[in-house]
Amino acid sequence: GLQLQGLEVVMICHSEIVGKPAAFLLMAEGATVTVCHQMTRSVAMHSRRADVVVVAVGIPKFFGPDMVKPGAAVIDIGINQQELPNGRVRIVGDVDTDQVKEIASWITPVPGGVGPVTVGILMRNATIAHQRQIEAGWLAA
């Protein structure tokens, strides 16, 4: 996996659920974290110096190629519906993946990137919690 110690991480989000906990977890791993939100001026100025960028703003293709440092890792947490000219809908992230992947060294796709990992971790945690309830005598085996 990616060693975070000493890396510059920019989180472009403003979320009590994702942003703050993730920022604290990243800092605990030794990363220097900058959190940008809707009131941040010149978001691209911050993101262009980052080794890792995490994007969760709810705006389709918000994060473009002019916002990323060559070789950076980009984690797209956004899930957006985009209507196509034929009336169909497709799921896209907050990152313009087709453009950014030419510059970044690593990028998560949407769909199929962060979502399946989240589901897997939730299932693992639910299993651990259930086992602990059995061990504590709260549930029958």
Predicted segments with their positions:
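Rossmann-fold NAD(P)-binding glycine/threonine-rich loop
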Residues: P70, I75-W138
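Glycine-rich phosphate/diphosphate-binding loop of Rossmann-like nucleotide-binding domains
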Residues: G1-A73, I77, Q82, R88-R90, ...
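Flexible, glycine/charged-enriched surface loops at secondary-structure junctions
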Residues: G6, G64, E135-A141
